[in-house]
Structure formats: structure tokens, C-alpha cells
UniProtKB/Swiss-Prot annotation:
Pathway: Amino-acid biosynthesis; L-histidine biosynthesis; L-histidine from 5-phospho-alpha-D-ribose 1-diphosphate: step 5/9. Residues 3-211 form the Glutamine amidotransferase type-1 domain. It catalyses: 5-[(5-phospho-1-deoxy-D-ribulos-1-ylimino)methylamino]-1-(5-phospho-beta-D-ribosyl)imidazole-4-carboxamide + L-glutamine = D-erythro-1-(imidazol-4-yl)glycerol 3-phosphate + 5-amino-1-(5-phospho-beta-D-ribosyl)imidazole-4-carboxamide + L-glutamate + H(+); L-glutamine + H2O = L-glutamate + NH4(+). This is Imidazole glycerol phosphate synthase subunit HisH. It comes from Trichormus variabilis (strain ATCC 29413 / PCC 7937). The lineage of its organism: Bacteria, Bacillati, Cyanobacteriota, Cyanophyceae, Nostocales.
Length: 211
């Protein structure tokens, strides 16, 4: 079974991500060891919480360069929730620079009548890269589970793999570019749809191993 390293920097619910990966047919290992990231077949960066503590926690564990090296190597990489946001250059939530792997900023939802912030609960994706491996075997507008007050705004729109609409605001819900994928929602909390997305990621890992 493919070995998927789940990065532990004390900013995520790692147990439910690992459970989802096991169901998807992978062997998850929770780690912040550079060697284990290098040895793994794929890497997942989960995360819940605030932007500044997250990037500080990654940097204090010397994980910034290993993450960049992993992505540059072509190894399948998946960011989840805050793990998507910290791939960007900066966030309105904090003052720390992000990893800057994807050009763009993290912005806050604007208050408007009839919506709550955070955007919390089930919502439908609009797939802007419908042929992305992440969306294989999914219905056209799948329902997934969100909890966030901030969203990513990439400079290059072609990296956007899906959007979601909250009130009148349509924002990026996922990005995909070559081996780098990241989602704002929580696949591990998104029932069968989320499990299928994790299974699709694991399938890509298998293909990479076989190539």
C-alpha cells in the first residue's frame, strides 16, 4: 500500500485524515521528520486554526524547505483547509509570510446580510477543472463540508480546481497544478464524497509509483 506522510505540526485533526486514508487504501504515517517525508510516496499537509501560528509552527520544525522540496520533486501533495492557505504568500488573518508556493493572498469573507462567518457546514462545489483526478467518480456539483472564515485568492486563475458560493461571494474551494493539490473543505468530514476524493488522491499516488 502507498505510504502517505501526514505532516504533524500540531495544527490539525490528524486522526480523521489518517482514518480516511486507511479506508482509501493507503498507509498513513504521522510525522514531522524530513527523512520520512522524503521516503513517503505522497505527503498531506492538514491544518485547522489560525494562519500565523501555523506557519510559525512549520518554521520552528524546519519544515518549510522539506515541503517545498517535496512539491518540487513531483511527489503527490495534498493540502487540506489551513494546509491550503499556508501555501499562499500572505493572509489577511495574520502578519507572517506564507510559504509562497502559490502566488496569491488569503482573504476574509465580507459580511453581508443572510450569511454567517465562518462559512460552516455543507455546500456544493462548482468544478472549474472537471477533469482533475481529484474529482473522478464524483457527481457534477458534489456536497462537501466547510469550516472557514478566510479563502484563497490565487493570482493565476488556471490553478483553481473548484469554487464555492457563500452568499453572493464565489471563492476558490480547491486548487490543482500538476502534482500539487489542495482543498479548503474537509474531505475527512465529507462522508462518501470526501472518501472518494481521498481515494482519487491515493490512486494518483499508485500511478506515480507504477510509472
Amino acid at each position: 500500500m502507498p505510504v502517505v506522510a501526514v505532516i504533524d505540526y500540531e495544527m490539525g485533526n490528524l486522526h480523521s485524515v489518517c482514518k480516511g486514508l486507511e479506508k482509501a487504501g493507503a498507509t498513513p504515517i504521522i510525522t514531522h521528520s524530513h527523512q520520512e517525508l522524503t521516503k513517503a510516496d505522497a505527503v498531506i499537509l492538514p491544518g485547522v486554526g489560525a494562519f500565523d501560528p501555523a506557519v510559525q509552527s512549520l518554521r520552528s520544525r524546519d519544515l518549510e524547505q522539506p515541503i517545498k522540496d517535496t512539491i518540487a520533486s513531483g511527489k503527490p501533495f495534498l493540502g487540506i483547509c489551513l494546509g491550503l492557505q499556508i501555501l499562499f504568500e500572505s493572509s489577511a488573518e495574520g502578519t507572517q509570510p506564507g510559504l509562497g508556493i502559490i502566488k496569491g493572498k488569503v482573504r476574509r469573507f465580507i459580511s453581508e446580510p443572510g450569511i454567517t462567518i465562518p462559512h460552516m457546514g455543507w455546500n456544493q462545489l462548482e468544478l472549474t477543472q472537471p477533469k482533475s483526478i481529484l474529482w473522478e467518480h464524483l457527481p457534477p456539483q458534489p456536497w462537501v463540508y466547510f469550516v472557514h472564515s478566510y479563502y484563497v485568492d490565487p493570482v493565476e486563475p488556471q490553478v483553481r480546481a473548484a469554487t464555492v458560493t457563500h452568499g453572493t461571494q464565489t471563492v476558490t474551494a480547491a486548487i490543482a497544478h500538476e502534482n500539487l493539490m489542495a482543498v479548503q473543505f474537509h474531505p475527512e468530514k465529507s462522508s462518501n464524497i470526501g472518501l472518494q476524493i481521498l481515494s482519487n488522491f491515493v490512486s494518483q499516488v499508485r500511478e506515480k509509483i507504477a510509472a
